[in-house]
């Protein structure tokens, strides 16, 4: 499962472990019951009749277990209970490892989530590809328009127009080209890669692998899918959410509920 993101990036699922079922199994270790099943089944107490014969009386009464509903709700009820009441450890029994290609400035925000494990491509050892993030004019304009509700996007009270946005992007592209020339020149001159990389902008694309349990992926999404999160990391969070929805659909439904 792979999603192409921004102009040169992607997020790809490498592996996942566990499932909605394994969350239930982990929670039920304390009672040794295990996974009982999803969906509705005939009530085991009244065998689906809705009535519970009371030995000391001659009349039947409503089943005390299913309350006359004939069926019992499956383990989705327990899953919902665990999620609602923040029983966190069962959700730590499942998780995912993903590979991400994103601008370095996105990774700097991403790495604030210290409960994930990371390993990133290093410009100390290999040259980074000459790929830099170039936002669209629409992105610049939309960011300026949200400055009143998102203080990180504030534009110092200045109104951005379309021509100014285009001019700035042209200057940005020239800056990227100059930075790459300085970077390559340094390598050709014999400057160590770990120092030549000083010329690389934070818009340069890098790659990493990130791994976390399901609980911590959901915590990541709570922050990075929020409306006030920066757009560039939000698109990656949305892709992670689609991976979770595919691998853990019942938990995902609870998270979005």
Where are these regions (language model features)?
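Family-specific signature for flavin-dependent thymidylate synthase
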Residues: 1-47, 52, 66-257
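Short linker/helix segments within small regulatory modules
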Residues: 54-60
């Amino acid at each position: 499962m792979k999603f192409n993101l921004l102009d040169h990036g992607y997020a790809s699922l490498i592996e996942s472990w566990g499932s909605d079922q394994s969350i239930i199994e982990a929670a039920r270790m304390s009672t040794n019951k295990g996974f009982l099943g999803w969906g509705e089944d005939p009530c085991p107490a009244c065998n689906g009749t809705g009535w519970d014969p009371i030995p000391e009386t001659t009349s039947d009464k409503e089943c005390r277990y299913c309350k006359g509903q004939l069926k019992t709700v499956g383990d989705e009820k327990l899953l919902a209970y665990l999620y609602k009441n923040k029983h966190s450890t069962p959700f730590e029994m499942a998780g995912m490892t993903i590979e991400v290609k994103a601008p370095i400035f996105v990774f700097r925000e991403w790495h604030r989530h210290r409960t994930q494990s990371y390993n990133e491509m290093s410009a100390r050892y290999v040259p980074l590809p000459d790929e830099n993030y170039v936002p669209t004019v629409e992105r610049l304009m939309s960011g300026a328009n949200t400055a009143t509700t998102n203080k990180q996007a504030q534009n110092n009270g200045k109104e951005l127009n379309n021509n100014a946005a285009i001019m700035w992007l042209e200057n940005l592209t020239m800056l990227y080209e100059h930075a790459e020339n300085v970077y390559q020149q340094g390598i050709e001159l014999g400057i160590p890669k770990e120092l030549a990389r000083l010329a690389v902008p934070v818009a340069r694309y890098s790659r990493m692998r990130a791994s976390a349990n399901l609980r911590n992926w959901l915590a990541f999404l709570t922050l990075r899918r929020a409306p006030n999160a920066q757009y560039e990391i939000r698109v990656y969070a949305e892709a992670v959410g689609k991976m979770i929805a595919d691998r853990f659909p019942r938990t995902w439904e609870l998270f979005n509920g």
